[in-house]
């Protein structure tokens, strides 16, 4: 087992990474008699809910659970309210622990519930997808979507710990594995050139779920994110760099309808648009743009815009992005592979040109 610590100004919490952690009662530091509400969905529940309940009950915990509908389109206030109803009907108090057992949607909604219920209860994240293991479960971002924009209603709320059992990836559909690799590649592109080179050498092993490669990959991603969050917990500075490709990607998700493209798929194409724009601005070389495109393609990820979207469809969605300040579009771009920056008020004509470069042509 590996342990990565997230060091915040006032406290720290561990990220445990290993194989078989869910069935080990020692993974859960909850006192005997402690109340627990597990938030999950039917897809994850069929594989892992009984395992987690059994381990918790061996510790003497009193365990309830609530099932949310599965999918990005259910990352809503309605799903949030299902959690609140279950907590209230079960007479859960401020001393309860909410466990988010699932992917990014479950982690975001359950995390927001933990931040909100009785003004805050303890949260443990147990991410079961590659994307949530390397990204969304770490750092305390919680949110639900609005029909006009992704992640528009939420809070920063840190978990007390994150438990990453790599065995959960064995039941993950290949498409979900590939989507998670988009966030993995992002880390190398923005902050760690050596890791990007490692990915070029080992991406095929990750696609094949090689255990050793996965453990190294997940721990490196978590360490990179932990370091960024420690410097900038609430995204006032460097943490914005973690959003490479996300402004373009969120536009795709919102325009197509949540869930039609997976988040990682949208981020993959968004990263190519950001790289194309970076090259237009004279930053990254065309050779490095090609390296990024080839790596994403080897991970079976899209690198061009959906054929149902026109370049002009992007900007209205992008202007609702949370990074927009005083009506000015702010984008994460690349100086080079391994070095990102935030560009302020990029000309819309250049943005459209970059999107057009990533548009499908027959």
Swiss-Prot record:
Compartment(s): Cytoplasm
Organism field: Haemophilus influenzae (strain PittEE)
EC number per UniProt: 4.2.3.4
Pfam families: DHQ_synthase, DHQS_C
Name of protein: 3-dehydroquinate synthase
Function comment: Catalyzes the conversion of 3-deoxy-D-arabino-heptulosonate 7-phosphate (DAHP) to dehydroquinate (DHQ).
Cofactor(s) for this UniProt protein: Co(2+); Zn(2+); NAD(+)
Catalyzed reactions per annotation: 7-phospho-2-dehydro-3-deoxy-D-arabino-heptonate = 3-dehydroquinate + phosphate
NCBIfam families listed in its UniProt record: aroB
UniProt xrefs under InterPro entries: Dehydroquinate_synthase, DHQ_synth_AroB, DHQ_synth_fam, DHQS/DOIS_N, DHQS_C
Residues that bind Zn(2+): 183, 246, 263
């Amino acid at each position: 087992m590996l342990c990565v610590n997230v060091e915040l100004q006032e406290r720290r919490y561990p990220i445990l990474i290993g194989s078989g952690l869910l069935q080990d009662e020692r993974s859960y530091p909850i006192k005997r008699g402690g109340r627990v509400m597990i938030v999950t969905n039917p897809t994850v529940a069929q594989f892992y809910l009984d395992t987690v309940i059994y381990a918790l009950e061996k510790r003497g915990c009193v365990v309830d659970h609530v099932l949310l509908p599965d999918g990005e389109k259910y990352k809503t206030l309605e799903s949030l309210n299902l959690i609140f109803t279950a907590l209230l009907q079960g007479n859960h108090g401020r001393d309860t622990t909410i466990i988010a057992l699932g992917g990014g949607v479950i982690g975001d909604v359950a995390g927001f519930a933990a931040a909100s219920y009785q003004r805050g209860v303890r949260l443990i994240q147990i991410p079961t997808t590659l994307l949530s293991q390397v990204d969304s479960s770490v750092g305390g971002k919680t949110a639900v979507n609005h029909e006009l924009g992704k992640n528009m209603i939420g809070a920063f709320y840190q978990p007390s710990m994150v438990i990453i059992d790599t065995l959960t990836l064995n039941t993950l559909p290949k498409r979900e594995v590939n989507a998670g690799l988009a966030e993995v590649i992002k880390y190398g592109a923005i902050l760690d050139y050596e890791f990007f080179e490692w990915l070029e050498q080992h991406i095929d092993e990750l696609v094949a779920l090689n255990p050793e490669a996965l453990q190294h990959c997940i721990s490196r991603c978590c360490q990179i994110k932990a370091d960024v969050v420690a410097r900038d917990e609430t995204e006032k500075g460097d943490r914005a760099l973690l959003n490479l490709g996300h402004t373009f990607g969120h536009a795709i998700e919102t325009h197509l309808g949540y869930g039609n493209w997976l988040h990682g798929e949208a981020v993959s194409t968004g990263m190519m648009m950001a790289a194309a724009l970076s090259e237009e601005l004279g930053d990254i070389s065309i050779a490095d743009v090609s390296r990024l495109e080839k790596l994403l393609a080897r991970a079976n990820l899209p690198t061009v815009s959906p054929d149902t979207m026109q370049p002009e469809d992007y900007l209205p969605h992008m202007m609702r992005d949370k990074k927009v300040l005083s009506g000015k579009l702010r984008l994460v771009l690349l100086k080079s592979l391994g070095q990102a920056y935030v560009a302020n008020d990029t000309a819309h004509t250049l943005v459209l040109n970059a999107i057009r470069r990533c548009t499908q042509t027959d």
